[in-house]
């Protein structure tokens, strides 16, 4: 089974980062307030205007992006965790 987002939605595979304090305590992503990172795995076709014309998304599969910690909806496809969100929930592309 594969997943294809609709319209202006994208699917992101989160990049998990664990950091340690100087004392060796691991701080999981769930305890951090900074933006999250991920790789786009699928994109929708784009948005439609009032005339029915489709505007394609600016983001593309393979882009590494920053997004807000609470953005989107978490799903699981074939055991892989994905976040589905609208394109405008993405903060930016990491080069």
Swiss-Prot record:
Function description: Together with the chaperonin GroEL, plays an essential role in assisting protein folding. The GroEL-GroES system forms a nano-cage that allows encapsulation of the non-native substrate proteins and provides a physical environment optimized to promote and accelerate protein folding. GroES binds to the apical surface of the GroEL ring, thereby capping the opening of the GroEL channel.
Family matches, as Gene3D superfamilies: GroES chaperonin (2.30.33.40)
An annotated GO cellular component: cytoplasm
Subunit and interaction comment: Heptamer of 7 subunits arranged in a ring. Interacts with the chaperonin GroEL.
Organism expressing this protein natively: Rickettsia canadensis (strain McKiel)
Signal sequence bounds: none
Annotated PANTHER family: 10 KDA HEAT SHOCK PROTEIN, 20 KDA CHAPERONIN, CHLOROPLASTIC
Lineage, highest ranks first: Bacteria, Pseudomonadati, Pseudomonadota, Alphaproteobacteria, Rickettsiales
Subcellular location: Cytoplasm
Protein name per the record: Co-chaperonin GroES
Record keywords, A-Z: Chaperone, Cytoplasm
UniProt keyword annotation of Cytoplasm present: yes
């Amino acid at each position: 089974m594969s997943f294809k987002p609709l319209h202006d939605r994208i699917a992101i595979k989160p990049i998990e980062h664990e950091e340690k304090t100087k004392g060796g305590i691991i701080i999981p992503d769930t305890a951090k307030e900074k933006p999250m990172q991920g790789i786009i795995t699928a994109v929708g076709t784009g948005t439609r205007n009032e005339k029915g014309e489709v505007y394609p998304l600016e983001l593309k599969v393979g882009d590494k992006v920053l997004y807000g910690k609470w953005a989107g909806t978490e799903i699981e496809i074939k055991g892989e965790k994905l976040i589905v969100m609208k394109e405008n929930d993405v903060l930016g592309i990491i080069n």
